[in-house]
From Swiss-Prot:
The name this protein goes by in its record: LL-diaminopimelate aminotransferase
Alphabetical list of PANTHER family matching this protein: AMINOTRANSFERASE (PTHR43144)
Subunit structure: Homodimer.
Upper lineage: Bacteria, Pseudomonadati, Chlamydiota, Chlamydiia, Chlamydiales
Catalytic activity reported: (2S,6S)-2,6-diaminopimelate + 2-oxoglutarate = (S)-2,3,4,5-tetrahydrodipicolinate + L-glutamate + H2O + H(+)
Functional note: Involved in the synthesis of meso-diaminopimelate (m-DAP or DL-DAP), required for both lysine and peptidoglycan biosynthesis. Catalyzes the direct conversion of tetrahydrodipicolinate to LL-diaminopimelate.
GO molecular function: L,L-diaminopimelate aminotransferase activity; pyridoxal phosphate binding
Domain of life: Bacteria
Positions contributing to pyridoxal 5'-phosphate binding: 71, 104-105, 128, 174, 205, 233-235, 244, 275
Annotated residues for binding of substrate: 14, 41, 105, 128, 174, 275, 369
Key word Transferase present: yes
Residues the record lists as N6-(pyridoxal phosphate)lysine modifications: 236
Gene Ontology biological-process entries: lysine biosynthetic process via diaminopimelate, diaminopimelate-aminotransferase pathway
Protein family according to the UniProt entry: Belongs to the class-I pyridoxal-phosphate-dependent aminotransferase family. LL-diaminopimelate aminotransferase subfamily.
Amino acid sequence: MKRNPHFVSLTKNYLFADLQKRVAQFRLENPQHTVINLSIGDTTQPLNASVAEAFASSIARLSSPTTCRGYGPDFGLPALRQKLSEDFYRGCVDAKEIFISDGAKADLFRLLSFFGPNQTVAIQDPSYPAYLDIARLTGAKEIIALPCLQENAFFPEFPEDTHIDILCLCSPNNPTGTVLNKDQLRAIVHYAIEHEILILFDAAYSTFISDPSLPKSIFEIPDARFCAIEINSFSKPLGFAGIRLGWTVIPQELTYADGHFVIQDWERFLSTTFNGASIPAQEAGVAGLSILPQLEAIHYYRENSDLLRKALLATGFEVFGGEHAPYLWVKPTQANISDRDLFDFFLREYHIAITPGIGFGRSGSGFVRFSSLGKREDILAACERLQMAPALQS
């Protein structure tokens, strides 16, 4: 049996797995210290009571011979698709265009597999490392990094002389924590239409947006229906990280170059490759959408971001993002300090684990990412430790 040649292009370990190994090793060698882990974007708040009740009720029905059921619909429960259309998208996306899945990362892999190998894929730099790995695993012909630099407010730089087939775009962004405004998103949509580019828009953090003028969906730009697919997730807002539930939107207007409708092929693709998301997860998702605008967990994580930002600024760092995303993109004031050295410094001196920016791409060099998804007591303890960071000041 021959090895899949695409594995050769991957690094030995996935970024976050490697970081957790380093943290575990530090804990093993330094049992006297308590490490606060702000390096991963994992949720810490429990399920809302009404969501947990819906989940439990669904499981109870599966345990009864009179109410149990087998496979659900391949494309998702009609009630969940309809509620997303009405409550989340306010009618700008039809229920038939929404396809329920087992999470955003799985859908990203399905989509890049669906469009096939030999595509030229453009990715924001820095970006969530799964984009790069999945593009490699699915046989991308070329992967183009779009620098998102501080001097451009982390807005991607687009080439004028390079053909792109697929653009992976994330807003609110992971890792920079920044969000595109409507004018910026409209400009990207028009660029994509002009250059015949498909946008895969990752909106997994859209529920963190508190400013009503900022777009939560790419389909707030009407022309995006001709060039974009949107991916979203219940993981962060509802605490479904371990439950696995997400969705993808395929507009009915979206076509290939030959005029064939993408949604028709997607339905055929899912019928072959996916038997539908967990029914209890979907029924819990319906309950979650009813309380999403008032969800306490989102406010909790925003408050965490505010606490971290104040502590980091007081320490002398430059801080970006965090207002509309659970991530803060942080630049040390000390010159000539590498990402790895900064990671080790925090772990060694303050027993705080963060994510080195270089792990998200070359343009992440000189930055680190803080996650605000931790427990409040850990955030407060981290803020207290950050007050003792004179060694990092210029």
